């Protein structure tokens, strides 16, 4: 009985790892990549975006080594950068601009300061200006506060 459960556990573990690897491969194949600061920024963008895009979180900071690795990894991708409209966000933007000089820089209104704090209709308009597809519900209900 223990051997069967042990085997089933490792089978599920291997399937789970395989699924993660396949999903990572699919994400690596995407042509568009967005770099953001935090997980809540990523979640906000994912809720508005209506097209496949890999979203990379820097967690507010990035080492020079990781930045160079990303530059090598993303050299043939369309890179978008959306960071907070605060001092740390602008510092990160400058760092990213050096490595990704052809990236499309997106900006939230300074009134919101943070990507995660901006309303979805505002994020939708920012993404739309960069020719990214968004869920139209966030454009249609702009006046109703969605």
Swiss-Prot record:
SUPFAM superfamilies: Toprim domain
GO molecular function, one term: ribonuclease M5 activity
CDD domains associated with the record: TOPRIM_RNase_M5_like
The Toprim domain, residue ranges: 31-119
Matching PROSITE patterns: TOPRIM
Biological-process GO terms, alphabetical: rRNA processing
Lineage top rank: taxon: Bacteria
Full protein name: Uncharacterized protein YusF
Gene: yusF
């Amino acid at each position: 009985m223990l051997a069967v459960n042990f085997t089933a556990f490792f089978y599920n573990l291997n399937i789970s790892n395989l699924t993660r690897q396949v999903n990572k491969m699919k994400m690596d194949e995407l042509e568009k990549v967005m770099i953001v600061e935090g997980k809540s920024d990523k979640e906000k963008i994912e809720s508005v975006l209506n097209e496949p895009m890999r979203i990379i979180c820097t967690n507010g900071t990035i080492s020079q080594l990781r930045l160079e690795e990303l530059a090598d990894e993303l050299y043939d991708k369309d890179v978008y950068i959306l960071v907070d409209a605060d001092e740390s966000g602008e510092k990160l933007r400058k760092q990213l601009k050096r490595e990704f000089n052809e990236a499309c820089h997106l900006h939230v209104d300074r009134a919101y300061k943070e990507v995660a704090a901006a309303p979805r209709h505002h994020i939708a308009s920012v993404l739309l200006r960069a020719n990214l597809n968004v869920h139209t519900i966030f454009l249609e209900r702009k006046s109703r506060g969605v």
